[in-house]
């Protein structure tokens, strides 16, 4: 039986990371590495508080649903840490810290000429984040972004880290840079929308998404248009416009009954509403349609969410 989310956050944490093979094609462009960092916060265990309070307590579930909906591309789990000894990692990092971006040995040249350097720095970055050394991680990311401005993976990592460090405006600026290159990037649109909504720009965020939808429709990008509509539905839910969100998911299901994502989202919403019978029906349909290898992995329990390798077919 689907248990009520008003009693526990365990169901919420169980649907954060998703592995899957594409259903209707890769949802987002391929990126070599992506990190979603969310620190778990304790939720109220009382089931007696009113509907608005319940949504306030579980507002972060909107992030959860969006993450699950977005990650329908093929990707693997946490990469094996670099086999290089710690001393080698630290040595490379010291070289990066001491490197003055001179004409002789700029960091970009080091990364281009030394294949192991990127993986070594990636492993070091992961260590810094896991230890909560945010400032050190940010400094490293700033250098990586400057050295490899075309690599959106570093910008995604940096944006998410800035958001968690309480610097939403800087995070949004980074997402905007990503969107300048790929205006229909699902994750950049979604996460930027979340930041806008948290900043009290409720109407502006919906207009921003409507503009993105118009771009997709004007270019006859059916898949991208559908993805933006999924984000819009999610924002409606986040803004407590539950009926509108459910209506949107229902319309998306009518247009493509084989897409499991709207079923998943409706199941999550019904769970939040303690409508367990309806939630069970939606989750059953979602499991029926999702790929056989589709997995849901809870990793919200860790202080730092995992780094992942994406293996889609599209390029940014």
From Swiss-Prot:
Q: Please provide the record's keywords in A-Z order.
A: Chloroplast, Plastid, Repeat, TPR repeat, Transit peptide
Instruction: List the taxonomic lineage.
Output: Eukaryota, Viridiplantae, Streptophyta, Embryophyta, Tracheophyta
Tissue expression remark? Ubiquitous. Preferentially expressed in newly formed green tissues.
The region annotated as signal peptide is none
The places in or outside the cell where this protein is found are: Plastid, Chloroplast
Record GO cellular component, one term: chloroplast envelope
Protein's GO biological process: chloroplast organization
InterPro entries in UniProt: TPR-like_helical_dom_sf (IPR011990), TPR_rpt (IPR019734), Ycf3/AcsC/BcsC/TPR_MFPF (IPR051685)
Q: Give TM regions.
A: none
Q: Does the keyword Plastid apply?
A: yes
Name it. Answer: protein SLOW GREEN 1, chloroplastic
Judging by the UniProt lineage, the source's domain of life is Eukaryota
Q: Which SUPFAM superfamilies match?
A: TPR-like
User: Matching Pfam families, A to Z?
Assistant: TPR_16 (PF13432)
The entry's function note states: Required for the early stage of chloroplast development. May be involved in chloroplast protein biosynthesis and/or degradation.
Species per Swiss-Prot/TrEMBL record? Arabidopsis thaliana
Q: Where are the TPR repeats?
A: 118-151, 152-185, 226-259, 261-293
Annotated transit peptide? 1-39
